[in-house]
Amino acid sequence: MDLSTGRPRDTWGSKAAFVLAAAGSAVGLGNIWGFPTVAGQNGGAAFLLIYLAAVALIGAPVMLAELIVGRRTQKNPVGAFKALAPRSMWVVVGGLGVFTGIIILSFYSVIAGWTLSYIFKTITGTFVAGVDTEAIYNELAGNAVPAISWHLLFIMITIYVVLGGVRDGIERWTKVLMPVLFALLVLLAIRAVTLSGAEAGLAFYLKPDFSKVTGAVILSAIGQAFFSLSLGMGAMITYGSYVSKRDDLVSSAAWVTFADTTIAILAGLIIFPTLFHAGLEPGAGGPGMVFVVL
C-alpha cells in the first residue's frame, strides 16, 4: 500500500520485466564507458579477473540485500531505513544514497547527452571512413552550447520515461531497449574481434599479468563493481520496493548481476580490439576513449 495515495503500490508486471528493468538500471555507462576505461588503466585481464571476483563475492550479495530491504519496506531508500531502524542514524545512509545518485546523475547525464549526439551524427552520416573521431569528440566536449543542448534533451527524455511510472514508463521502455542494446553489443563485438590487430587487444584483455595487481587495482575493481551494479545509492532498494512478494529475489539478483557483468565483458571485447586496431594505447584516452575508438 502506498501511504501517500492510499492506493495499492504498483509492482513490476513479471519477474522478467523486473530483471530487464533492474538490469537496465545497473547496465549503463558504468559498463560500456566506465569499465573499459578503468580496465585499460589498470592492466586489462588482471583487473577483469579481480572485477569478476568482486562482483560475485561482494556485488551480488549486496544487491540481494538492497532488494530485500526494498521489498520488505516498500519504500524509497530514506523511508526504508527509517522503517527498519526508526529514531536511529541509519536514515542518514538512505539520504547519502540519494545524494550519491544525484552526484552520479550530474555527470552521467552529460555523457548520455554525448551519446545522443553521437547517435544523431551516426544517422546523419558524420562517421564515414577516415573521419577524425578524436576531433569530433573534442569539438563536442569542448563546446558548451551543443553539449548542454544534448544534455537537456537527455534530461527531458528521462523525465518523460519516469513520469510514466513503473509499468507504463520504465518497464515498457526497458523491454524494448535492453534486447536492442544486447543485440547491438553482440554485433559490435563480432565485428571488433575480426579487425586487423584485434589479437593484441584480446591478449591485453584476456591474458592476465598478475604483476600489475596492486592494492589500488583491487580497490578500483571493487569500486567499479559497485558503480556498474548501481549499488550503494538506493537504486536497487527502490527497484526492490516494486517487486511482487511472489518473485524469488535470489534468482532475480543473480540474473541482474549476470546481465550487467555480461555487458561489461562485451564492452571490453569491443573496445580493446578496436583500440589496438587503431594503434591507440589502452587507458591513455581517459573518459573519451570509448567515443574516440567507436
Segments and roles (model prediction):
Residues 20-26, 52-57, 96-107, 153-160, ...:
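Hydrophobic alpha-helical transmembrane segments of multi-pass membrane proteins
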Residues 55-60, 96-117, 180-189, 259-270:
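Hydrophobic alpha-helical membrane-insertion segments
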Residues 6-10, 38-42, 77-96, 109-167, ...:
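Inter-helical loop and helix-membrane interface segments of multi-pass membrane transporters/permeases
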Residues 2-12, 171, 175-294:
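Membrane-embedded translocation segments of transport machinery
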Residues 11-22, 47-50, 88-102, 149-152, ...:
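Select transmembrane alpha-helical segments in multipass membrane proteins
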Residues 14-54, 200, 234-240, 251-254, ...:
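Transmembrane helix-boundary motif of multi-pass solute transporters/channels
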Residues 1-34, 62-67, 71-84, 88-95, ...:
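Membrane-interface "cap" regions at the ends of multi-pass membrane proteins
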Residues 9, 46-51, 91-95, 133, ...:
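Membrane-interface alpha-helices at helix entry/exit sites of multi-pass transporters
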